[in-house]
Structures are given as C-alpha cells and as structure tokens.
A protein has these predicted regions:
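N-terminal low-complexity, intrinsically disordered segments
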Residues: 72-82
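Exposed, interaction-prone extracellular/peripheral surfaces
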Residues: 2-48, 64-69, 78, 87-100, ...
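Structured adenosyl-cofactor binding patch, chiefly the S-adenosyl-L-methionine
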Residues: 126-129
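A positional/architectural concept
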Residues: 52-56
Length: 310
C-alpha cells in the first residue's frame, strides 16, 4: 500500500525503496525549495562564519592588458615571453560537479513511526539529484551500506541521475546485516569522497551521523576547504525521547544483538544522553561552518520543505 505525500510522490513500504518512488521527484525539480528547519550553524554559530562558495571560474583566454585590469590576474609568463603585459580572462563555469554521500548503513535502518531513516535518506537524495539535473550540473557521489559501496564519478544530464537512483535502490536494504564490515564506515567513505571530489564542488552529506568522530572531522576540514558542503541529518523521534509509558513501566527492546529492558524512570537519562550526542554533532558542523539541516523520518519529506516567497 502506498502512502501518498501529495500528487504522485509515494512511499511504498517504508522499509525499502523502489525506483519509481525516486523517479516521482521529477515533479519537484524546478521548485526553489528550502528546508523548514533552519540549519544548526545558523541558529548556534556565534562567531563562526559559513563559507559561501559559488560556482568556480574557468580560464577563458589571454588578452593585452587594459587600463583598469586587476594586476592580480596578469599572466606573467605570457608578459615575459612577449614583452607586453597580458591579462587572464575567466568566465563562470557552465556546470558544477555535485556529489551526494548517501549513508544507508545499519544505524539508518530504523524507523518508529513512518519510514526507515534509510528510506527517507533515499527520498532526500532523489530530490537533490533531480534539482541537480535541472540546473544542468553533473552528478556523482557515494552510496554505501554496511557491506557495499558504489562510487560514482560525476556525469551530466540523465546519466548521472539514473546511476545514482539505481544504486540507491539497490543498496537500501530492509534489515541490518548480521555481520558488519568496518571497512564501510563513515570515516572510510569520507576519505573516499575526499579523493573523488573536484575543487569547487557542491557536496551533500546525508546520514544520521551516528559514526561522526574526531577523525571524520579532520577529513571534513580538508574537503570543506575548497568545496561547499551541506549536511543533512536524518533522525527519528524515538532516538531523542522514549514513549510516555516508559516513564512508569519497563520498556522491552529487541535487536539483532539481543534484547533487554529500559528500567522505570530511565527516560530522563536516555533523553540527556541523546541531547549530548546531538550537541556534539551540531558543534562539529558549526566549527566547520557547514549548514546542518535536519530531516525527520516520521514525516513525509515534502512537508519538511517550503517554497520561499519572492
């Protein structure tokens, strides 16, 4: 049974994705959307400033120096060779590489109310992919779960889009793997991304960032130096707050690793630990000047965006 967002954008099962779900976001490709929730660094940043990097500038040609030209763009090698001052001319890049890092690892295979975080992540990645295609930019990225990874070099038009959507469908699994592969950690994928990206790229990181640590932060610093990064955190309400009945009764929890109980009154400790964990994630991106947008798996994706007034 499909859960209709609006128009023809469906969530089918909520535990995995099918290609037609992701293709349906074509109808949103021309909308100038903004997340309803402000980015964390905009709310908390203080003295940290976000880096705003526009499209890169490509070298076009060299011409004779003219009065008023910026001396910083004089081509000194041509000037020395010809004996006359020459200036470099640049134009804005016609297309820009866009990379999406899509985390579908085991911690993302969770959802308490609407869909799994992994499913919501795929829908968000699809929305960003379609808008990338609409702008005429090239799309590449990395899609990974706990045992597999797809590394996609940027391609233009529909080729980059369809490859990315296909890999998203294939790697979005219904249940966690019984044996996890440490070589597919977030840190490993960020290192892979640092080798894949091209200077001046736009990068979208889609994850719950449960594996974010100091080593990841060092790699982010390197990537962020010459690129524009947006971080998208996918979360579920149960990760932040236990159900109300857990305040008075024991709450049984089951997983592949076993089962157990939350003791009565454990809700406060659980909430405090969750808040501390979230604060660390927020602070990591604040220090990097990277916008952190928050998307919840308990609501349809498009309800978490709005079209800004012109």
């Amino acid at each position: 049974m499909s859960i209709a967002l609006f128009d023809n954008t469906p969530y089918r099962t909520g535990v995995d994705v099918q290609l037609n779900e992701l293709l349906s976001y074509k109808q949103q490709e021309k909308l100038q959307l903004q997340p309803t929730a402000k980015a964390a660094y905009q709310q908390l940043a203080g003295n940290y400033l976000a880096k705003i990097k526009g499209r890169g500038m490509e070298f076009a040609e060299v011409r004779h120096y003219q009065p008023g030209d910026d001396v910083r763009i004089i081509d000194w090698s041509v000037t020395a060779r010809t004996g006359k001052a020459h200036t470099k001319l640049f134009h804005e890049e016609k297309e820009r590489p866009v990379f999406i890092l899509l985390d579908l690892s085991d911690s993302m295979i969770f959802g308490s109310q609407f869909v799994f975080k992994s499913v919501q992540a795929c829908h968000l990645a699809s929305l960003l992919s379609w808008q990338t295609k609409q702008r005429g930019d090239r799309l590449g990225g990395i899609v990974f779960n706990q045992q597999q990874v797809a590394e996609l070099k940027p391609r233009g038009r529909s080729k980059g889009l369809m490859r990315f959507l296909h890999e998203s469908e294939q790697l979005c699994v219904k249940q966690p793997f019984k044996q996890s592969d440490a070589s597919q950690s977030l840190l490993v994928q960020l290192k892979r991304l640092s080798r894949l990206v091209q200077t001046g790229s736009q990068i979208h990181l889609i994850s719950d960032f449960s594996q974010l640590d100091d080593a990841c932060q060092k790699i982010l610093t390197l990537i962020n130096r010459h690129n524009q990064i947006n971080a998208w955190q996918i979360s579920d309400p149960l990760e932040q707050l236990l159900p109300q009945h857990a305040l008075k009764n024991q709450l049984q929890v089951n997983s592949l690793q076993g089962s157990g109980f939350f003791k009565r009154g454990a809700s406060k400790d659980y909430q405090d630990a969750a808040s501390l964990r979230q604060q660390k994630i927020d602070n990591t991106f604040i220090k990097q000047g990277i916008p952190l947008y928050k998307v919840c798996a308990s609501l349809p994706l498009m309800e978490q965006f709005h079209v800004p007034a012109r």
